[in-house]
């Protein structure tokens, strides 16, 4: 499980370290994909990515919509590994997609991580915090 918010600056090669506490969860690999509907990068441990892929196979969404979703997730995904110092290099297409400049935020989101440009994250975090109580109330009603 991933949680917390971590702030980093990209080095001259576009790398940043991931928190040491989460690195063991990523030892088998990491899949980076564009956030769906959000200007961020999803970072899934390989085992979680495989679970996501399997769950999508059994969904009852219309085939044309499923093809679009698969293209959005899988065609633009990258299989990456951390270097010996625990650093991650963001692929240029994903870096551009998410508008990542120098300052990045890594946010733990349960079974995956999200990588955001710091400025974009601040706006998203505020919106999420403002809506969280409404979502919780809806969950409590069911």
From Swiss-Prot:
It comes from Dehalococcoides mccartyi (strain ATCC BAA-2100 / JCM 16839 / KCTC 5957 / BAV1). Forms oligomers. The keyword Oxidoreductase does not apply. SUPFAM superfamilies: AbrB/MazE/MraZ-like. One of its GO terms (molecular function) is DNA-binding transcription factor activity. Belongs to the MraZ family. It holds the Pfam family MraZ. It is found in: Cytoplasm, Nucleoid. HAMAP family: MraZ (MF_01008). This is Transcriptional regulator MraZ. Signal peptide: none annotated.
